[in-house]
Curated annotation (Swiss-Prot):
The lineage of its organism: Eukaryota, Metazoa, Ecdysozoa, Arthropoda, Chelicerata. Amidation at Leu-64 is not mandatory for activity on P2RX3. It comes from Alopecosa marikovskyi (Wolf spider). This is Purotoxin-2. The toxin is composed of 2 domains: a highly rigid N-terminal inhibitor cystine knot (knottin) domain and a rather flexible C-terminal linear cationic cytotoxin domain that forms amphiphilic alpha-helices. Enhances the high-affinity desensitization of human P2RX3 purinoceptors. At 50 nM, the toxin decreases the IC(50) for ambient ATP from 2.67 nM to 0.77 nM in human P2RX3.
Length: 64
């Protein structure tokens, strides 16, 4: 199996290579840094909605 790209690591070479987090797959998020011309920077990120969902699930686990 091909190695996946860890959280916050560069994924511009393969946008579908991000690893899985505890419950969700990270997404390759790209942006253009200010002052740079057409140099796209991509890294594996955890979407905010996933962070919130993980917090809710963790809380549910601790209250059970």
């Amino acid at each position: 199996a091909k190695a996946c790209t860890p959280l916050l690591h560069d994924c511009s070479h393969d946008r579908h290579s991000c690893c899985r987090g505890d419950m969700f797959k990270y997404v390759c998020d790209c942006f253009y840094p200010e002052g740079e011309d057409k140099t796209e920077v991509c890294s594996c990120q955890q979407p905010k909605s996933h962070k919130i969902a993980e917090k809710i699930i963790d809380k549910a686990k601790t209250t059970l």
